[in-house]
Amino acid sequence: MAKVVLAYSGGLDTSVAIPWLKENYGYEVIAMSADLGQGEELAPLREKAIKSGASKIYIEDVRREFVEDYIFPTLKAGAVYEGKYLLGTSMARPLIAKKLVEIARKEGAEAVAHGATGKGNDQVRFELAVKALAPDLKIIAPWREWDIRSREDAVDYASARGIPVPVTRERPYSLDRNLWHLSHEGADLEDPGNEPPSDVLLLITPPEKAPDKPAYVKIEFERGVPVKLDGEALDPVTLIERLNKIAGENGVGIADMVENRLVGMKSRGVYETPGGTVLFLAHRELELLTLDRATLHFKEIVASRYAELVYDGMWFVPLREALDAFVDVTQRTVTGTVVMKLYKGNCTPAGVKSPYSLYDQELSTFGRDEIYNQRDAEGFINLFGLPLKVRALMEKKAGLR
């Protein structure tokens, strides 16, 4: 019997995909789930996949690989999509696809499948990664083929086959969780005019209910990578887990946004990224201290393009690798310590130090002029403003003024 390897999350979409693939393709279905830091969600997957009709399931622990090879490069790049989204789902999809291909090769499968909808970004991310890594594999996307047209239809389909799913008609939210973030979409969130219900947040305390006393965290970076939290050297997974807890308790990391999907429509999502938000802002503060003006400003352009590549599923492309090479050069001096103050949803800097600081206090203060002669500014302004002056004079001469 021919085999298909399904990217399995245990959620609604992939739960109903198992019997559907068997009924419509006659495949032996092998499930593959990536442990990206979902935590307790993984516990019931093995039994659930088998009960749903899978012949076996692989649960791959890729947490450290996720952090070191996907999260940290994106963090160093300073990538954030449309000013708010820290790319938690986008970064995870190419890694899941990579593991999907590895299991397919191991099992001799002729196809892979995923549970992404035909309206979303994830279908693109999964399939571009598979095409880049294994162009010979057939890709099946049930949502683009079956008669199920809504999450409610999928719940009915699962119920008819005795498949337990975590989504009910009363709470039909689509969730995606990993070490970096938790996303919420669907139901009443689809109307951007609605405030998210108070029970939506699962990782972060609502800011108004957060402690009345601020919390401080000290993060040490080496070449753009966080290595210590409050003076303690930690492995990357533990560092993010601890920071998630501290930031979440203080209401930090909520992003409620309407974003432009790759497939051409806008969508509304609520993202919880507690630790990631702190790391992103802390890293930015350290760059402001250690990078020169030209490098910093050009890196902002790179960050925007990097975010688009990751969001669009273009992880395994030469351009992303080339941008990584540029970013790595910029991070040579991004070493130091940043203290961040967390208070009722706010995350602000409370001190930054680096042995590579480009800030010269004596030069920057309004004191004596031994180092910086203020009279020199006049000549600089005359030369810097010369194009403006010449243009104005020529326009006046031509009667345009």
UniProtKB/Swiss-Prot annotation:
GO terms in the biological process aspect are: argininosuccinate metabolic process; L-arginine biosynthetic process; urea cycle
Record: residues binding ATP: A7, Y8, S9, G10, G11, L12, D13, T14, S15, A34, G115
What CDD domains has UniProt attached to this entry?
A: ASS
Keyword annotations from UniProtKB, A to Z:
Amino-acid biosynthesis, Arginine biosynthesis, ATP-binding, Cytoplasm, Ligase, Nucleotide-binding
Q: Which GO terms describe its cellular component?
A: cytoplasm
Task: Name one molecular function that GO assigns to this entry.
Answer: argininosuccinate synthase activity
Q: Which residues bind L-citrulline?
A: Y85, S90, N121, R125, S174, S183, E259, Y271
Show the catalytic activity.
L-citrulline + L-aspartate + ATP = 2-(N(omega)-L-arginino)succinate + AMP + diphosphate + H(+)
Pfam families, sorted:
Arginosuc_syn_C (PF20979), Arginosuc_synth (PF00764)
Tell me the compartments it is located in.
Answer: Cytoplasm
So what EC number does this one have?
6.3.4.5
Where do transmembrane segments lie in this chain?
none
Where L-aspartate binds, per the record, is at T117, N121, D122
Pathway(s) served = Amino-acid biosynthesis; L-arginine biosynthesis; L-arginine from L-ornithine and carbamoyl phosphate: step 2/3
Q: Which family does it belong to?
A: Belongs to the argininosuccinate synthase family. Type 1 subfamily.
Q: How does it assemble?
A: Homotetramer.
This protein is called what? Argininosuccinate synthase
